[in-house]
Regions:
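Amphipathic, hydrophobic secondary-structure cores in small proteins
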Residues: 31-47
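Helix N-cap motif at beta-to-alpha junctions
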Residues: 47-53
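Conserved short beta-strand edge segments in small beta-sheet-based binding/regulatory domains
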Residues: 65-76
Length: 85
């Protein structure tokens, strides 16, 4: 399982990006959230298999009015919590 934090730039606000990405992610069994930012970008955090996340990103970029020009991605493969001594 992988968690990705992604910032999308381009024509990503006012074109149904959040709705379409939510629908696609849900259909692939992914979890997470997506929101518009004040600077015109969209921020997303998504969790699931690497293959499903890749499929979601491919499908988002195929949507009619969405034009992603840049994606900044941070991947998390596991989280380590500190233990009490």
């Amino acid at each position: 399982m992988v968690r990705k934090h992604i910032f999308f730039s381009g024509d990503v606000q006012g074109v149904g990006f959040r709705y379409r990405s939510f629908y696609i992610a849900q259909s692939l069994g992914l979890a997470g959230w997506v929101e518009n930012l004040w600077d015109g970008r969209v921020e997303m955090e998504v969790q699931g298999s690497e293959a499903s996340i890749r499929e979601m990103l491919d499908r988002i970029q195929q949507q009619r009015w969405i034009n992603v020009t840049d994606m900044e991605t941070v991947s998390y493969t596991h989280l380590t919590l500190p233990t009490k001594a």
